[in-house]
């Protein structure tokens, strides 16, 4: 079981819920950025993406946000669609993905492939 490292949102029914969690909680930000990096390397390492998606799903449960994001893990045809919904829910610009991944790797000292 996943242990939540941050409290649930005070606005669980809002469309802004996940975006707010991204701003307020390091634990959620870490899982979100890990998912971005895993997505950018999806073709080389699909397993890593699946793991990151599962971790992110657990972190979403911790937020209490009703909106949620279906990442379609295990369904390669729908990965792109799920990731687009993730970006929209978290209000992340697609153009920023590379920089966010680099930032994540620096913040958490993750070796770059």
UniProtKB/Swiss-Prot annotation:
There is a cross-link at residues 17-65 (S-cysteinyl 3-(oxidosulfanyl)alanine (Cys-Cys)). The modification 2',4',5'-topaquinone is found at residues 2, 108. GO terms for molecular function: metal ion binding. InterPro entries: MB_blue_pigment_sf. The modification Cysteine sulfenic acid (-SOH) is found at residue 65. One of its GO terms (cellular component) is extracellular region. Keywords: Disulfide bond, LTQ, Metal-binding, Oxidation, Secreted, TPQ, Zinc. Its cofactor is Zn(2+). There is a cross-link at residue 108 (5'-tyrosyl-5'-aminotyrosine (Tyr-Tyr) (interchain with Y-108)). Zn(2+) binds at residues 108, 112. This is Ranasmurfin. It comes from Polypedates leucomystax (Common tree frog).
């Amino acid at each position: 079981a996943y242990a939540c490292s941050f409290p649930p949102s005070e606005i669980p029914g809002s469309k802004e819920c996940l975006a707010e969690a991204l701003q307020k909680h390091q634990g959620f930000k870490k899982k979100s950025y890990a998912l971005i990096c895993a997505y950018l390397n999806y073709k080389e390492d699909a397993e890593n993406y699946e793991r990151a998606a599962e971790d992110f799903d657990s972190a979403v449960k911790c937020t209490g946000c009703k909106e949620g994001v279906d990442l379609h893990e295990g369904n390669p045809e729908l990965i792109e669609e799920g990731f687009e919904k993730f970006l929209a829910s978290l209000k992340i610009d697609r153009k920023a993905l590379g920089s966010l991944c680099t930032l994540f790797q620096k913040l958490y000292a993750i070796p770059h492939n």
